[in-house]
């Protein structure tokens, strides 16, 4: 049952800007069990498949453009790679510290409140000056730096990248696309690196399937909420979750 619940939590919260890693740690604490970072990463592979299906048209377009040696798609792919590098560096260099944070509900609560602040600010950022193809490399790096902070439980990956993209002037629909696309290498890499740490069971595989299905639902919801200017709802939720975690866990 625990694996099933964690699968649902991972699927829904991976793309909603409320921090999937933070919620996995919270529910693990509620179950009074030790955080299984390996299983958490395994669930990331499920949401990797969900986002790959959700943005399959964009991925196919980029791959086709690269094979045809079209400059705009080569540049876009290069920017996505650049956006990924900071998170990879942080994950490899500070993996042990990050894993230890999963056991600190106080820090998770603090980080959730930071995510909440970013979400409240995001709804007021609507410059619509840039598209996914027109952002400069410097912007791609900045968005990547924001994503790097999301390795900490309680800091939302989708929340930080959406905030950064909107702050830098990207239109809302393209900000969502860019956030989803740049999540692919990070979630895939994290899942593959941690696979060696888990022993597969039928319950964990079922949790994987549930995480995949709920991930598709989460993708649809976050796209609708961002375009509709309703990110503040997630901000208020993060504050409530932060209060609960700090006071009662």
Swiss-Prot record:
Its main location: membrane. GO terms for molecular function: undecaprenyl-diphosphatase activity. InterPro entries: UppP. The chain crosses the membrane at residues 11-31, 35-55, 80-100, 101-121, 135-155, 175-195, 202-222, 226-246. Keywords: Cell membrane, Hydrolase, Membrane, Transmembrane, Transmembrane helix. It is a multi-pass membrane protein. It comes from the Archaea. It is found in: Cell membrane. The keyword Phosphoprotein does not apply. GO terms for cellular component: plasma membrane. Its EC number is 3.6.1.27. It is an enzyme of class 3 (hydrolase). Pfam families: BacA. The keyword Transferase does not apply. It catalyses: di-trans,octa-cis-undecaprenyl diphosphate + H2O = di-trans,octa-cis-undecaprenyl phosphate + phosphate + H(+). Belongs to the UppP family. HAMAP family: Undec_diphosphatase. Catalyzes the dephosphorylation of undecaprenyl diphosphate (UPP). This is Undecaprenyl-diphosphatase. It comes from Methanococcus maripaludis (strain DSM 14266 / JCM 13030 / NBRC 101832 / S2 / LL).
